């Protein structure tokens, strides 16, 4: 599914938070040993994004809320639902992974509730080893990348589908 990048300038907002325009080349500025489950979001990039988000960054919060209201809600009609106030931010640098284990979000340790859906929004092109890999049916193990271009999003069941990342080459 696509979204209007002019109405919902999520990439531009991420660039603002990180202080970088060329998201595809962040690996030229930041290098880390391969992440573990304990440190996969302990980077300067995550700190910049979440610090800005927690500061009351109205440009992002307003855009994100509008995206949910105008793009996501129509998919579900009038059905009531709640959504994550602070979205999860993933950085998938070359030579690393975003999350270093395959998992289902509802499994112990991840603790996401039953019935939760995932909406992944691409602010860069996602393909091959820089994409999230997921099985198509719970337990099937037929992993394939969820490929998207910047300006696209996908809705999927990360609570039931085993998914993760490859080392981004």
What are these regions, as identified by a protein language model?
Residues 1-75:
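N-terminal auxiliary "cap/dimerization" subdomain that precedes the catalytic jelly-roll/cupin core
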Residues 52-60, 107, 111, 146:
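Conserved aromatic-histidine-acidic binding/catalytic patches
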Residues 138-169:
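Catalytic core of Fe(II)/2-oxoglutarate
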